[in-house]
Amino acid sequence: PAFTVRALARKWGTRRTYLGAGGKGTAFGGACRSATGSQWARAMVCLMAMQGLGKPGVNFGNLQYGAPIDYNFYFPGYGEGGLSGDVETTGAAVQLYQRQPQLPSMNVVAQRITRNRIAEAILDGETHGHPIDPKSINGQFMRFHYPAPGHSRVRMMYKYGGSHFGTVQESNRLADAYRSSELEFVVNQSIWHEGESKFADVILPACTNFERWDIGEWTVAGGYSHHNNGQLNHRVISIQHKCIEPLGESRSDYQIFLSIMHRLGMGTYYSEGMTELDWCRAQFEASDLPGRISWEDFLEKGYYVVPPEDTAKTPQPVAMRWFAEGRRKDVPEPHPLPAGYGTTFREGLQTMSGKIEFEPSSLKMFDDPGRPPVNRYIPSWEGRGTTELYGRFPLQLVTPHPRYSFHTHTDGKDTFINDVEEHRVLVDGYYYWVARMNPRDADARRIAHHDLVRLHNDRGSVICAAALTERLAPGVVQAYASSAVYDPIGEPGRSPD
């Protein structure tokens, strides 16, 4: 209601406000992750600008991001490329490539496809999109077209990792693309043979993490953004010991790729003569771990807990305080890149004026209805405001980020996660995804707790187990957004999931 908005505005405007909103409260998700979410994110910046962003008590922060951990202790994250040698599409160039020199990997194919348009590329033969360009603002508007001039259409797909069905909209499109004659050959590298691996012509069996060496830090998306430690109020780096040899004919992902590269005559270039354990040690040596623990002790213990930084001895600058006081940037992070500053290096922000712009000059250079220069509310094309659709589909589905699975990482593996009723419910021998709804909506449809229900719209349908709760308002249904294994009951793309 309007009076609630006005009350919040008065309370906000009459005292110092520290904003704990955004997609990083639990490391992923948030209001910004929607079709028009950039408008919400811009609004948050404008609200903090009116408070005086960077002044004492006036700043951004998100739950665990305020934890007193040592952000300066370096360990490479999964967005930094690992052993790939790729400095174009990973974050390796920021630190890792200098710390861990490796042979470069360059993809000479300039053609690209937006992941959410793979189905259109295969079925229609053409599509377009905009890249994610973390290096510049203007680069995000560089529209590309597929197929690119001088390039052929995609005829083969090599699917490794991830879950397209669980993380794209209208996934029936993918079922049609996989079965299309336009896609001549599909290889899938899979551990569990779930979901889309069943569409493959050739399946390369990968082993589990218990059957190979690895090294990593808990809950860190490093490389995608600097100091990206989320979900935990501590830092733990662990070595993943190889417990047993790979079962059956399975191999580790590294060994599968190495075998292919040997067939192509480039095995030595790919491996650089190193085993998986050698690469683990290379990552160890590239980090700040050698200054705290020896490789032998780390290997024996299996983990290292990074102590919280003693801020009394090494006080850290406050984020954005330099901006509020008109000083040069003194925060220990490499962004923006030197050429990204709007004015002088380390002075001001990445905008063209170096200031917070309520009407960004850069957006005036592009005619993009989804990113207007003056921020405004852009209504969704679906919802209660769309009369015709709302008449046919009177329940609004709300889909927050999953709590118990991530890109199918823990779903469909027949583990103890299935016993968590918030995740799946056992009905007649099958574990169903959960859809929560208000009891009044359920009564009107004669739905009881844990009855099977079919959620559907014009794009497709999913069979779930209903969970009745007063925590939802009437007219609203809640189910986790993604990360369920694709399991159609009939013809793929033509039957409920």
Language model regions located:
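Intrinsically disordered or highly flexible coil/loop and linker segments, enriched in small
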Residues: 2-4, 11-21, 53-60, 163-166, ...
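Conserved active-site and cofactor/substrate-binding residues in soluble primary-metabolism enzymes
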Residues: 3, 38-45, 169, 181, ...
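A glycine-rich, hydrophobic/aromatic-adjacent loop/helix-cap motif
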Residues: 3-142, 214-216, 220, 368
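Acidic/polar loop patches that form or flank catalytic/metal-binding clefts of enzymes
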Residues: 6, 19-20, 53-62, 186-189, ...
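Active-site rim elements
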Residues: 31-35, 242-249
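Short, hydrophobic/amphipathic alpha-helical patches that form generic packing surfaces
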Residues: 42-49, 258-263, 400
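A cross-kingdom feature strongest in bacterial/archaeal respiratory oxidoreductases
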Residues: 50, 99-246, 284-497
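Extended catalytic-interface subdomain
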Residues: 237-240, 254-261
